[in-house]
Amino acid sequence: PNVRLSDEIIARRGAELAVVAEEAYQQLLKDNPDALHPVYIVGSEVPIPGGSQDAVETGLQVTKVSDFKQTVATFEKAFHDHQLDEAWKHVIGVVVQPGVEEKDAGCTPYDRSKAADLMASIKEYNNLVFEGHSTDYQTKISLRELVEDGVGILKVGPGLTYMMRE
């Protein structure tokens, strides 16, 4: 079915993966006591592989501030429920939709005015930045604006993957 999973299911699965990562890190420390602790990016707003097929025509919806905050709270609870309170301190980013998308026939450029409320909301979280997916077709100016506005992790994929494949 083409139905999005609930935030609770996504967060639970994320926490389950973090349990495995934390266990692997503890094993790594036995051989490498100076190993860096893993960091985590959480979220539920991940686009389909290859980008949206209709987003350019219909217009993208920027993540609502309330949805972003609910995502953070849901993941924090899932980490807590899996005894990962210490690991939660290593969550550094949250995946959001800042209004950019890539697709076969083009891309939706970043419009900071449409994302202003979302971008302002990250300032409430001192330890977090946004991760923006599908940013590799944005202009240099748009990339700079994304970073200035709070997208500290630019997720590339389709363009880079295509170039490597070719």
Per-region residue spans from a language model:
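Hydrophobic faces of well-ordered beta-strands that scaffold small-molecule active sites
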Residues: 1, 38-44, 92-96, 128-133, ...
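Glycine-rich phosphate-binding active-site loops on the catalytic face of alpha/beta enzymes
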Residues: 1, 139, 149-165
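Internal, well-ordered domain-core segments that constitute the primary functional module
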Residues: 1-50
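Active-site loop/helix belt of alpha/beta enzymes
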Residues: 14, 41-81, 85-88, 92-100, ...
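Flexible, glycine/charged-enriched surface loops at secondary-structure junctions
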Residues: 24-37, 81-91, 133
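Short, glycine-/Ser/Thr-/acidic-enriched flexible segments
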Residues: 47, 99-101, 137, 159-161
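Conserved, mostly hydrophobic/aromatic
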Residues: 146
